[in-house]
């Protein structure tokens, strides 16, 4: 787990919370009263807040965590709870009777632990854990359209398509960092920003035949939550883990990889 995580108080402004999520690259921030856990705020929560409503406090948008754990709980049990709750991390408190926040444990933390212990996954190759029929966006889509698609589907990252080939990835973090959350819908931007302006390209990608462990290692190395699964990739010579373009087959997430180990 990550001990002593950055927290915000219940009366912290959403503007401050947004800057923390943007500047520190956090996916989630615990909300506390003193050191007592009250709730959490995720990037998804921030995306649902209008850019003009900066006077809202953290208590107004925080949600009760779906999973709360304690330091002594077995890591495999926590992993199953996180997967079943469809989340990527959980706050860690001192005990069931003491809600003092002591850390955060994420899917990435658990995967790193499994790799360090050289535990073998139950599914062996990427193709076995790949999700097909992927939700995508086009390189020339306005960010407002992608924002709506992420909000409607619950996906925090989408492959970017141009001429039927994947050329990049765009995530909630990219949109938050761009400063264009909701602005185009509220008249704050005269000319809508398009996906190609902020997407990450060339994307890190993987093929179906690769080992699940390889996917886990790439996710940890690049601190990414999902990998496009591709066919006929055109690799970057200096960075062979990235592709200039490829045919999109599916996508594999950290949760898919974790499920390959513990389900």
Protein language model annotation of sequence segments:
Residues 1-4, 42-68, 75, 79-83, ...:
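Tandem CBS (Bateman) regulatory domains
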Residues 7-25, 32, 69-88, 93-96, ...:
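The conserved cystathionine-beta-synthase
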Residues 11, 20-25, 40-45, 88-91, ...:
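Short acidic/polar alpha-helix capping motifs at helix-coil junctions
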Residues 30, 39, 91, 159, ...:
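Conserved catalytic/dimer-interface elements of ABC ATPase nucleotide-binding domains
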């Amino acid at each position: 787990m990550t001990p002593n995580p950055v927290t915000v108080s219940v009366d912290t402004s959403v503007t401050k919370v947004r800057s923390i999520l943007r500047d520190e690259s956090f996916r989630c921030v615990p909300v506390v009263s003193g050191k007592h856990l009250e709730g959490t705020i995720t990037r998804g929560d921030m995306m649902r807040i209008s850019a003009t409503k900066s006077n809202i406090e953290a208590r107004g948008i925080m949600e009760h965590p779906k999973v709360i754990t304690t330091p002594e709980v077995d890591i495999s049990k926590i992993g199953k709870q996180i997967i079943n709750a469809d989340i990527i991390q959980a706050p860690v408190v001192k005990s069931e009777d003491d809600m003092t926040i002591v850390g955060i444990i994420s899917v990435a933390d658990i995967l790193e632990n499994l790799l360090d212990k050289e535990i073998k996954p139950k599914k062996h190759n990427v193709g076995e854990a790949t999700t097909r029929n992927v939700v995508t966006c086009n390189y020339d889509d306005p960010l407002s359209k992608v924002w709506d698609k992420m909000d409607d589907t619950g996906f925090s990252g989408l492959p970017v398509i141009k001429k039927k080939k994947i050329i990049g990835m765009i995530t909630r973090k990219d949109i938050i960092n761009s400063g264009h959350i909701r602005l185009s819908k509220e008249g704050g931007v005269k000319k809508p920003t398009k996906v190609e302006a902020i997407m990450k390209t060339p994307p890190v990608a993987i093929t179906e035949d690769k080992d699940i462990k390889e996917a886990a290692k790439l996710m940890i190395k690049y601190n990414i939550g999902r990998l496009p699964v591709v066919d006929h990739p055109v690799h970057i010579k200096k960075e062979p883990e990235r592709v200039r373009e490829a045919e999109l087959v599916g996508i594999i997430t950290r949760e898919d990889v974790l499920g390959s180990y513990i389900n």
